[in-house]
Amino acid sequence: MDYLPLFFDLKAKPCLIVGGGTIATRKARLLHKAGAKLHVVAPKVSEELEKLVAASNGKVFKQEYDQTFLDDVILVISATDIDAVNSVVAADCHAIKLPVNVVDSPALCSVIMPAIIDRSPLIIGVTSGGEAPVLARRVRSMLESSIPAAYGQLAQLASKFRQRAKDVFENGDLRRRFWENILNGPIAEKVLGGNLAAAEQLIEAQLDSASVEKTGEVYLVGAGPGDPDLLTFKALRLMQQAEVVLYDRLVSEPILEMTRRDAERIYVGKKRAEHAVPQQKINQMLLELAQQGKRVLRLKGGDPFIFGRGGEEIDLLAEHKIPFQVVPGITAASGCASYSGIPLTHRDYSQSVRFITGHLQEGKENFRWSEFVDKQQTLVFYMGLAGLETICSKLIEYGKSPSTPAALIERGTLPEQRVHVSDLAGLAAKIEGLDVHAPTLLIIGDVVRCHEKLNWYK
């Protein structure tokens, strides 16, 4: 280990910045955020930097640096663009063992500034020891995207109840279990969702009952159309903390691999004319697993509230007062259309869009076909592969032009994506014998004309 990470308490402590430009200002923002009293020495000082110094009750010296400015400060940052000045500042600090950071010159530093993830009071520093600062910033960016912004509030909540938890749970093991349940369960999710009052009430109730019983919860998460990069941050976070995963056929393997390695996986997939697990049984499984105190992930392709029967699955949970969350996913219409270069609405072609289930009940159609013939409307049929011929012929029968452009998108957003473009009269014949497999999405309307020009995902 080249450096030992330490955290510096700078509240009301005098710190010196040598330099007055953009880099010096950037460093001053960090020190000011940490509560430092800022002193700046430089012939020219930016307006923002002067304001930061004034806000910290420090002083600005518009002159050249000399060693006397090191008196009574506890940290020095040299941020000039003159190498000779930076070298002198570093040498002066080393001589009196005063911590110094010289920007972009690790060899001159006695301390280095990490890339920072600030979720105060939770603070994370990432450094490459000055060897690869761009890489350190890249790692910081990855952490920023995976650590919810409200983690700071969660840490503050834990601090607020820390002493009381010690008083209630004198046994260290019980106290640890209590905090594990708090920080990994529904109470933490209340905080992350912005409901601090409800979180405090739940903690109060557990402390009043001196209970460490684990509370179950269900996460109804939309996995999107297939590409793992289309997952939301919240979806990924819940996927990685669930202990049991119930998933269906439309969840792609790369997305399934992003769940916890040790999570129990239960396949409840559905195919046309075949239900691996009946819907009512799925609902009951979610309830029973949550009642066992488990964190349960119901992972569904697309969006759970668009042809996903998500409302049915959480209805039983609500009746039994089981905590649950619903995380929307990018629905197939949005994802597949975007990856096919087909805008669902377009100033020249379509002023509205309609989502329709293409899953014909027992092979029969019960739609109001006359509502679908408007030329300025885009039609999107989900699960329409088996009923494709019926859908196309019925639209033509009720007045839709046989030459209306139509596209059948197969395995949209995935590397195997194929887009079959024709018109209402010819699409069914075009895909005959092509070994097309679900999941598919059918888009009908003049917006399909954009595919040839805008198709970027090839």
Curated annotation (Swiss-Prot):
Sorted UniProt keywords: Cobalamin biosynthesis, Lyase, Methyltransferase, Multifunctional enzyme, NAD, Oxidoreductase, Phosphoprotein, Porphyrin biosynthesis, S-adenosyl-L-methionine, Transferase
Keyword S-adenosyl-L-methionine attached: yes
PROSITE patterns referenced in this protein's UniProt entry, alphabetically: SUMT_2 (PS00840)
A Pfam match: NAD_binding_7
One example of a Gene Ontology biological process annotation: cobalamin biosynthetic process
Binding site for S-adenosyl-L-methionine: P225, G301, G302, D303, I306, T331, A332, M383, G412
Region described as Precorrin-2 dehydrogenase /sirohydrochlorin ferrochelatase: spans on this chain: 1-203
Chain residues that bind NAD(+): T22, I23, P43, K44
E.C. number(s) listed in UniProt: 2.1.1.107, 1.3.1.76, 4.99.1.4
Renumbered residue ranges of the record's region Uroporphyrinogen-III C-methyltransferase: 216-458
Pathway(s) the chain acts in: Cofactor biosynthesis; adenosylcobalamin biosynthesis; precorrin-2 from uroporphyrinogen III: step 1/1; Cofactor biosynthesis; adenosylcobalamin biosynthesis; sirohydrochlorin from precorrin-2: step 1/1; Porphyrin-containing compound metabolism; siroheme biosynthesis; precorrin-2 from uroporphyrinogen III: step 1/1; Porphyrin-containing compound metabolism; siroheme biosynthesis; siroheme from sirohydrochlorin: step 1/1
Keyword Transferase: yes
GO function terms (MF aspect): NAD binding; precorrin-2 dehydrogenase activity; sirohydrochlorin ferrochelatase activity; uroporphyrin-III C-methyltransferase activity
Catalytic residues, chain numbering: D248, K270
Annotated catalysed reactions: uroporphyrinogen III + 2 S-adenosyl-L-methionine = precorrin-2 + 2 S-adenosyl-L-homocysteine + H(+); precorrin-2 + NAD(+) = sirohydrochlorin + NADH + 2 H(+); siroheme + 2 H(+) = sirohydrochlorin + Fe(2+)
Residues found modified as Phosphoserine: S128
Protein family (similarity comment): In the N-terminal section; belongs to the precorrin-2 dehydrogenase / sirohydrochlorin ferrochelatase family. In the C-terminal section; belongs to the precorrin methyltransferase family.
Task performed by this protein: Then it catalyzes the NAD-dependent ring dehydrogenation of precorrin-2 to yield sirohydrochlorin. Finally, it catalyzes the ferrochelation of sirohydrochlorin to yield siroheme.
Designated name of the protein: Siroheme synthase
Source organism per UniProt: Saccharophagus degradans (strain 2-40 / ATCC 43961 / DSM 17024)
Gene (UniProt): cysG
